[in-house]
Structure formats: C-alpha cells, structure tokens
Amino acid sequence: GIIYDRNGEVLAYNKLAYAITIEDVLSSGIDKSDKLNEIIYNTIKIIEENGDTINNDFSIIIGSNGKCEYSVTSDMAKLRFLRDIYGKSKIEELDTEKEQLSDNTAEEVFEYLVGKKRYDISEEYPKEDRLKIAIIRYNLSLNSFQKYISTTIASNVKDETVAAIYENQAMLKGVSRTMDIECIGY
C-alpha cells in the first residue's frame, strides 16, 4: 500500500516488478546438459536484448584482458567461494595430498565449471556467455534437491522482456516470470 506522512505526502509506495525464473524441468538424459545450456543462453539473450541484465553476485568476472578474475577482495571470501564451488563442507578440505584447490585461479575455476565434469558448456558460446550460463547453472544446482524451487535469473525486468519470454515459451522450458512487489521510498 501507500504510506503517507501527516501532511498527506507520499512517503513510500509499492510497485509491481517482474522477475524471470527457471526451474529444472528437463528429464535426465544424454543431452540434458546441452538442452539446459541452450535454454539458459536463449533466455539470457532475450533479457539482454530488452536492456535488462541477469542477477550476478558470483565471485568471478571477466576482466578487461579477457581473462577471468576474482571479484572478491579478501582471501577468506575467496576461500569460502571455492569451498562452495567444489562442494566441500570446510575450507580445510580444499587442500589434500591429491589436489590444492585453494590455489586455483579464477580462470581454472571457470574451466572447471564450463568443463565436462560440471556443466559441459559448449565452446561455441562466447566466453562471457559461458560464464553467465555457468552462474545460472550453479544457482540452479543450489536447489538441486528441491527441483520445484525456481531460481531467479533476472529481477525487475521490463514488460518487453516478459512479453518476449512468453512469446518464446515453447523453446524456453522451465522459464517463467513471477511478480514481486517492490517498495519504493522517498
């Protein structure tokens, strides 16, 4: 609702906002990963063509030199990120006699995520798009034991983006829009 001050001036109001979400609804199979990557790629393209951006709080970015780099500044934040990426329960488990995961560069983590061991993202996609697909796949994997929970790809998107998603619903299995209420304050 609308909140007024004692003089009748608007202090805050609610605004309808749309978000684009995805659920993993594909059946298991040999080409499931390729299909999911293609759905995510097509969704990203629609979102960006309409001037919106995907949600990205991932700790890897592509630097000006075209190489991946960490976006976190503290060593502890980097180690927590690596722990989560490699599925370890403790930071201490990153380093064993067999491997030293705590020393991995952002480029090595990127190659792990897009490689066959994890999300198998085709090199046909540009590097920046491969990273975006990996980010969304990683966020989807956080709900892998509760497949019915959707993952938000983009928030507060334009009506044009919502319309384009609906127009392409047949090729975007599992992708939908949700409505959120955004509180706007002065």
Question: PLM features: residue spans?
Answer:
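Membrane-proximal periplasmic segments of bacterial cell-envelope enzymes
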Residues: G1-Y186
